[in-house]
Regions:
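Perimembrane helix-loop-helix junctions
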Residues: 2-8, 182-186, 216-249
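Membrane-lumen/periplasm interface segments of specific transmembrane helices
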Residues: 239-284
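Multi-pass, polyprenyl lipid-linked donor-dependent membrane glycosyltransferases
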Residues: 75, 100-104, 123, 129-137, ...
């Protein structure tokens, strides 16, 4: 068993310079890719509702003025499309818009690296190369590269979800190492609460942007429970996770969901519309 002060220099203190280096390399690759492609590709979804939703995000909701201007997609959470509309309104070129919209993909790089660090928290050149290889492998998915030149909100919704996974896994590694190397590390164990709350908030943000992230949200919760160092800490983790999620949902999602419920009959329209319409007293 190591001394109580030795483990502080372990998994608790990731070499962020290494994460920064990996992020810069991934950023260069992503930006070079969108420049080589020649900018954004404009598909049917872009013309049907992406620009319209971005307009609502920037100029204000229009659910009480327009009658399903983009069909059922008119009720989709619009704020992830705000940058797209703003760039278009200010005359950005296709390449400039693609570079800006690729930023969430770049922001996922340090989160993926943190996941690799949590699983392999060793220092040294060889360990760093192993983590970089793991992170690079994660970004080799053709789907990820295909989304870089699109206006889809998939990457924007995936960014907070990936960070939620990273924070939960990292704090789980911290707590497990604290229990193993320093039985008196109660302060460290108690310090995971804010991180679990932050992870819950990020999950709520991802769900607000794209409800199909629900399955990934369950995965984050499973990781949070599975990495708890003691049975007694599971309840605290779940409570902090839920509190962070509810707070973020009330702040970020509920104002728009309330408008959607009142105008379209469901806060997650078109799902549950028939069941929830009677609660607002009219059939839109």
């Amino acid at each position: 068993m190591r001394r109580s002060g030795d483990w502080v220099a372990g998994v608790f203190r990731p070499p962020w310079w290494e994460a920064l280096g990996a992020t810069l390399l991934f950023a260069l690759a992503a930006f070079a890719w969108v420049v080589w492609l020649g900018g954004l590709s404009v598909g049917w979804d872009t013309l049907n509702h992406h620009v319209y939703l971005g307009w609502m995000a920037v100029e204000g909701g229009r659910l009480n003025q327009d009658v399903f201007a983009a069909g059922s997609m008119s009720c989709q959470y619009p704020y992830a499309y705000g940058p797209l509309y703003w760039l278009q309104a200010h005359g950005a070129t296709g390449v400039q818009a693609a570079l800006v919209l690729a930023l969430p993909a770049v922001g996922a790089a340090p989160a993926v690296w943190l996941i690799a660090w949590s699983l392999f928290p060793r220092r040294g050149g060889t360990a760093g190369l192993v983590r970089f290889a793991w992170a690079a492998l994660a970004f080799l998915s053709p789907l990820w590269w295909s989304l870089l030149d699109s206006t889809s909100n998939d990457i924007a919704s995936s960014l907070p979800m990936i960070w939620a996974f990273a924070l939960v896994l990292w704090r789980g590694a911290c707590d497990l190492e604290a229990r193993e190397c320093d039985p008196g590390g109660a302060a460290v164990l108690q310090g995971s609460g804010p991180w679990m709350a932050a992870a819950g908030a990020m999950v709520a943000l991802a769900l607000a942007v794209k409800i199909s992230q629900a399955f990934a949200a369950l995965g984050v919760l499973v990781v949070a429970v599975a990495t708890a160092p003691r049975w007694s800490t599971i309840g605290l983790r779940v409570l902090a996770f839920g509190a962070g999620g509810v707070a973020a949902a009330l702040l970020v999602w509920w104002p728009w969901a309330k408008q959607t419920w009142e105008s379209c009959g469901s806060p997650i329209y078109p799902m549950l519309a028939d069941q929830l319409r009677p609660w607002v007293g009219h059939l839109p």
